[in-house]
Design a protein with these regions (language model features):
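Surface-exposed, low-hydrophobicity beta-strand/loop segments enriched in small/polar/acidic residues
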Residues: 1-139
C-alpha cells in the first residue's frame, strides 16, 4: 500500500524554513523563490523546479518548515489524473497542483521511478529540473 503524499522514499531529509506566500497545508508540494535574503514558498505549479514538501501547515505570511529536495531524492506522490501501472515506470509526469501529478508528459516535471504494484493513484517519483523547452525555474 502506498504511503501518504510527500513521504520520502530515498534520500536524506533536508529541512529548510520558508515564508509562506499563501496558506499551505501539511504535505503540499512547494516551489521556492528567494529575494532579499528571504525564502518564500508557494504551492507548486507545473513546469517549475520543485523545492519540496511542507512538513506542517503554514499560514499565509508565516514561516514554516519544508523538506527540501535534492537530486536523486524520491517521494510518494498522489496521481491526480491517470492510472498508475507498470508501463508508466520510467516515464515522465507533470505536476498537476500542490497535491499531486498527472500521468502526462507535457512538461516532464518528474520521472516515475516505481509504484507498489497495486495502488493505481500513487507513484514514486524523482523531481528534476523541468525538461521542457522553456522552463520557469523558481527554486
Amino acid at each position: 500500500m502506498a504511503r501518504p503524499h510527500g513521504t520520502r522514499v530515498l534520500g536524506e531529509r533536508h529541512i529548510r524554513t520558508g515564508l509562506a506566500g499563501s496558506a499551505l497545508a501539511k504535505g503540499d508540494l512547494v516551489q521556492s523563490t528567494e529575494a532579499t535574503g528571504t525564502e518564500t514558498i508557494n504551492n507548486a505549479a507545473t513546469n517549475v523546479a520543485v523545492a519540496g514538501f511542507t512538513l506542517e501547515a503554514i499560514s499565509s505570511a508565516a514561516t514554516g518548515d519544508y523538506d527540501r529536495m535534492r537530486s536523486g531524492d524520491q517521494f510518494w506522490v498522489y496521481v491526480t489524473t491517470g492510472t498508475m501501472q507498470a508501463s508508466e515506470v520510467g516515464k515522465f509526469c507533470d505536476i498537476n497542483n500542490e497535491l499531486g501529478v498527472t500521468l502526462t508528459e507535457s512538461n516532464n516535471d518528474a520521472r516515475i521511478m516505481g509504484w507498489d504494484g497495486v495502488t493505481t493513484n500513487f507513484a514514486i517519483v524523482e523531481f528534476t529540473t523541468p525538461e521542457s523547452a522553456t522552463p520557469t525555474v523558481l527554486a
